[in-house]
Amino acid sequence: LFDAVRVDFSLRRLVHYTGSDWRHVQPWILLTNYHRYVDQFIKWSLAQLQEQNAYQSLILPGDIVIKRGMNAEEAAALIAQSMWHRFQMPAYHLTTTRGQGVTLVNIGVGPSNAKTITDHLAVLRPNCWLMVGHCGGLRQTQQIGDYVLAHAYLRQDNILDDIVPPEVPI
């Protein structure tokens, strides 16, 4: 699917952008552009590490590892050490014993970051990636917190015009 040069380039870019070794990236990937989802992912991940399940560690940007069974004070100290702000698109990896965990990448602002990170993640052949927390507006029937599945993209930013003609809907 990808030649060796492209794979090597993308793996190195993943480390550069996310602050994590590419080997930590899990096959189920969430992308977000809101830090509050990072906070919730960390909180949820820490709770998962306290339960009996397949999750074994949470890896933060800078390859900081929080392991199953670690007490709350130790985990909080490690979270505080994370230099996530040094990376353009910091990634957080909730790992399992069989490599079927979840990675969350905070892509920040802009479709160019989304394109960049997905281009580089593609060489890992993930099972799925999904953008969460990105909604341009609500209908009268919706409330804050409702699940929204985006199915369209307004082409007013001109980012993809050279690749996909503007008359083609995305």
Predicted regions and their residues:
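Glycine-rich phosphate- or other oxyanion-binding loops that anchor nucleotides, phosphorylated ligands
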Residues: 28, 69-170
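N-terminal short beta-loop-beta anion/metal-coordinating cradle
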Residues: 1-106
